[in-house]
From Swiss-Prot:
Listed PANTHER family: SPERMATOGENESIS-ASSOCIATED PROTEIN 1
InterPro entries assigned to the protein according to its UniProt record, in alphabetical order: SPAT1 (IPR039062), SPATA1_C (IPR031478)
Transmembrane segments: none
Name of this chain's protein: Spermatogenesis-associated protein 1
Classification via Pfam families: SPATA1_C
Residue span of region Disordered: 145-229
Residue stretches in coiled coil: 268-403
One GO cellular component term noted in the UniProt record for this chain: acrosomal vesicle
Main subcellular location: cytoplasm
Localization in the cell: Cytoplasmic vesicle, Secretory vesicle, Acrosome
Annotated organism of origin: Rattus norvegicus (Rat)
Keywords (A to Z) from UniProt: Coiled coil, Cytoplasmic vesicle
Subunit structure: Interacts with IFT20.
UniProt biased composition (Basic and acidic residues): 145-160
């Protein structure tokens, strides 16, 4: 396609960042790549071009923008469709303009290029790219401004997958003029005046999906491209009937052997790492089992000690209760005897006072002056004081008994509180056993 002679102003130009897909990232099986790995692409620089410029025209001038060293010899344009990058075909290169690679038509002003891998000299593999989708410079000869191609390019049906046959065919290509049995080979690519058999052969090769790409350096005019397209479509029907096909991708793999060896090394390393992880997991499981056994043994010891302490508390509490109730039974009879003795003592005290008072009355007329100094009066005072002392002693004994009982009750309450705290601690730790609560209520 011819370029527009009128150069646009700088304000009308768009800036595009050019990226190369690194080797090994392209998915040759699906013939695509996800946009998630765009961050791993290799930058080739940026260009300022007209948004109306087509990809076909940019292919011819890309070396001027980025430099010959920065541009790959053979490459394909990629376009972002959804979440993946797809290959742009040759026919689409003449239709797509650079404005479709910049906002608002695209998320980012970026242009992606896929270098084509060289395996058999002039033969290039790019998965399922057709002959119409890519041109190769090394596969054609330019003489006096015209493109020449051998008419014996189609392979034999008996050997469709032999790469040596194809390689030998291209080795004999420079000497095709010396062969007497071959047909005239000078022809202009896409000329509608070509012989029918040669045009059908070329179009058949162009419509069959193959891993081989051919480069055409001739810039055809728009009308000639349309005529060539019509001729290729007409010859496609003849090609389908003849069932002529090129070798499959299996005969010419696109992946180098170094990549396969690196994958094997990576696989072996992954296996080694997996075995190490499995060994570590086994060791961790064994350590866990050992620690669980130790934990079970410690729990059993704690339960045993807890049972022993619980039995000691039960025994002490039971013995104390037994002594208390036995003492209480004996105390009941003793209290009855004590009450009776106290009553007798009170009666005896009252009788003694009555006798002393009667004696005092009889002796009063004789000793009116020394009543306070009489012997009988002193005896009465001594008896009253002795009675008061006895009452104080009895009160002291009663208070002492109450104090002893209260001390014992406080000790029992402190023991119960300690037991409750131990139970609460066990519950917080989540132990399966639980200590009982002893309520030592002693009747008074």
């Amino acid at each position: 396609m011819s370029l527009n002679p009128s150069r646009p102003s700088s304000s009308e130009l768009v800036e595009l960042h050019v990226f190369y897909v690194p080797e090994g990232s392209w998915n040759y099986k699906l013939n695509t790549i996800s946009i998630e790995v765009i961050n791993n692409f290799i930058s080739a620089g940026f260009i300022r071009v007209s948004p109306q410029l087509t990809l076909q025209a940019l292919r011819e001038r890309l070396g001027e923008f980025l430099g010959v060293d920065a541009v790959a010899e053979k490459f394909l344009f990629l376009k972002c469709i959804g979440n993946n990058l797809a290959v742009v075909k040759e026919k689409q290169e003449s239709e797509l303009k650079l404005k479709s690679f910049a906002p608002p038509y695209a998320l980012q002003p970026e242009l992606y290029l896929l270098p084509v891998i060289d395996h058999l000299g002039n033969v290039y593999s790019a998965s399922t790219v057709n002959l119409d989708e890519q041109q190769s410079v090394d596969d054609t000869m330019e003489i006096d401004g015209t493109i020449h191609r051998p008419d014996s390019l189609s392979l034999s049906k008996d050997e469709p997958g032999d790469p040596s046959l194809l390689e030998n065919t291209w080795r004999d290509f420079p000497n095709h003029e010396e062969a007497e049995e071959s047909q005239p080979t000078q022809q202009h690519f896409g000329n509608p005046r070509l012989p029918g058999s040669l045009e059908e052969s070329d179009d058949c090769l162009g419509n069959v999906k193959s891993p081989f790409l051919w480069k055409n350096n001739d810039e055809d005019e728009g009308e000639e491209d349309d005529k060539a397209t019509i001729n290729r479509r007409q010859a496609k029907l003849v090609c389908d009937k003849e069932h002529s096909a090129l070798p499959d991708l299996i005969d010419f793999p696109s992946f180098p052997s170094q990549r396969v060896s690196s994958r094997l090394v990576d696989t072996s390393l992954l296996k080694i790492e997996r075995e190490k992880i499995i060994e570590q997991m086994k060791q961790v499981k064994e350590e866990r089992k050992y620690l669980e056994n130790i934990r079970e043994e410690l729990i059993k010891k704690v339960e045993k000690l807890f049972e022993q302490s619980k039995s000691k508390r039960y025994h002490a509490c039971d013995s104390w209760k037994k002594k208390y109730f036995d003492t209480k039974k004996v105390t009941a009879s003793l209290e009855e005897v004590l009450t009776k003795l106290r009553e007798d003592l009170e009666l005896y005290y009252k009788k003694l006072l009555m006798q002393l008072e009667a004696r005092e009355i009889k002796m009063r007329p004789r000793n009116l002056a020394n009543i306070s100094d009489s012997k009988n009066y002193l005896i009465i005072q001594i008896t009253e004081v002795q009675h008061a002392i006895d009452q104080l002693k009895r009160k002291l004994d009663t208070d002492k008994m109450k104090l002893i009982l209260e001390v014992k009750m406080r000790k029992q309450a402190a023991s119960d509180l300690q037991t409750l705290r131990a139970d609460l601690t066990q519950k917080k730790m989540g132990t399966p056993f639980r200590s009982p609560i002893f309520s030592g209520s002693v009747p008074t």
